[in-house]
Design a protein with these regions (language model features):
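Hydrophobic/aromatic-rich core segments of domains that either
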Residues: 22-90
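Short, surface-exposed coil-to-beta transition loops
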Residues: 11, 47-49, 153-154
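His-Asp-centered catalytic microenvironments across diverse enzyme cores
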Residues: 59-156, 164-166
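Secondary-structure boundary elements
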Residues: 1-13
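Soluble non-cytosolic domains of exported or imported proteins
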Residues: 15-23
């Protein structure tokens, strides 16, 4: 009998903390759909990896929650409060810098094919969101996150949504 400690289902990955990219991607699709977001997925040729795409303000972006999980290897354990954003709302070209596959297929939540050239907005490539490894919270006017490690001389940062100016507070 062959056994793998890894889960490929959305609920299995969440409950067992052993999800692979398929688990992350399908869980994200279900959550995003419940939130009313238009969502889909990207898949490498041969199915070696799968990640999400999401439509924001009429434009498609890549989100790879598997590669942004700092504990994606279940044998390494988890680091509470640490989460990456390197692959959050990035363009197809930005994704290709790290996801080096010859052919990528994109599909929306109804499995309709999407052309990679339709995932070309660079609006969020290289923005402050992708530089920090803490949860990012928001209210009506501001974003909040920790620069550095929370409780380890990290600073709480408040960023205005309108001006993107930052204000720093000692934690």
């Amino acid at each position: 009998t062959w056994f793998t400690p890894f889960s490929h289902t959305p609920i299995g990955g969440i409950l067992s903390n052993t999800g692979v990219c398929e688990s992350y991607t399908t869980a994200y699709i279900e959550i995003a759909k419940k939130l009313g977001l238009e969502v889909g997925y990207g898949e490498s040729a041969g199915g070696a990896h799968i990640w999400n795409i999401v439509k924001v303000d009429g434009k498609w972006y890549n989100i790879d929650v598997t590669w942004d999980d700092t504990s994606a290897n279940p044998y390494d354990g988890d680091t509470p409060g640490v989460v990456g954003h390197d692959y959050f709302l990035i363009s197809h070209d930005e994704l290709r810098e790290s996801h080096d596959w010859s052919d990528i297929n994109y599909r929306d939540q109804n499995f309709k094919k999407i052309n990679p050239s339709d995932i070309n907005s660079e609006k969020y490539d290289g923005t402050w969101v992708q530089r920090y490894d803490s949860p990012i919270l928001m209210d009506k006017d501001n974003y909040y996150y920790f620069e550095g490690r929370q409780g380890n001389d990290g600073k709480l940062v408040k960023v205005s949504k309108d001006t993107e100016t930052a204000e720093y507070f000692d934690s």
